[in-house]
Amino acid sequence: MIFTMYFFRNFVFLHSFMNYIIKVKSILINRYSLATCNAILLYFFQTNYYKIYLLVNTSLSFYNLIFFLRNFLRIVKKKNDPKVFLLALLIISKNYIQYALYCNFLFQVGNRTLKVIKSVEISKNEILKNDPSLKALEFWKKIKIFYSKNFISKIAVIMVISFSGYCAFNFAFKFFGVLKESSKILASFFSFNHDQKNDNSEDNRSEDDLKSSQDPVNIPSIEQSFKVEDFSIFNPDFWSTDFDKILLEEGYDLEGSLSTLWLTPRTFIVMKRIVQTGFYLSMCVANAYAIAETVKRGQPVSNDMLQFNPTLQTGFVYPYGQSMSAPGQIPGGIWAERLFLKKKCLLHKI
């Protein structure tokens, strides 16, 4: 339970920090000047707007925690095999540990970025009066005043932001096709039946007869699908196992085992995409730090920094550029070699 709460605490921070990095990337690289970006960042942290994100995401995380515990109790009532519990907890712990490592990395990058940004001199004359980002800040200032009035206003703000975030998440969820990829799995939650195909025998029945006589598939048990050794944290393949692919290929038992937990095969895909997004945004933070460090030393900013566009399909590297496969290190690839070796920035000191 303690480790679960630790995970959700880090997940709340990760989600809030990702929202902040999205603003950094769009402001710094695509549209505004460095001085404007620095001023906005300092204003954002000095006025504690990020606490609103923490409050909203804390409420959502507690809801997810209750949902997770409810489904876990369902497994306790249905299953009596201790191996099922062991393997389920190992899979969950594996994802929790990964998220904790990613959050710790992002936290270190964020602290270092703020220190560098605060050390760069900000010229307020460069900030335009008609800057749309400043209008957005004024809007948030009004929200903060309303939020600090009383307890009811706080609840109202949290509910509005939570509902808006929920709608935005659902729209993005459907837009990017995650529901399309897992439509068969979602449908199985209501039917709990699968089509059985026998490749060894010939079947001359028509398609209508086949549809009307579907039999449930004999789904392999969790002990048959996985080995205990595969879930050892000391196994190098443990950190690179594509669990969502395995679960989808095996046609996992959606009535019991892991599917009744919060971590369904569909959730594995969503969590994986969240991690990839965290990688992308952490790269943007690293690039923002590199630009700030370059300006601090009085050197011109190169075009490849301003046109920074990292890919999500990147591996891990040591701070000095050596390749690696262990988790918890700075993610990257070509972008890291460019920043670490060619530009000789101080990112490796994070």
Curated annotation (Swiss-Prot):
UniProt superkingdom: Eukaryota
Keywords: Chloroplast, Plastid
Ranges of biased composition (kind: Basic and acidic residues): 197-212
Subcellular location: Plastid, Chloroplast
Sequence segments annotated as region (Disordered): 197-217
GO cellular component: chloroplast
Chief localization: plastid
Protein name per its UniProtKB record: Uncharacterized 40.9 kDa protein in 16S rRNA 3'region
Species: Euglena gracilis
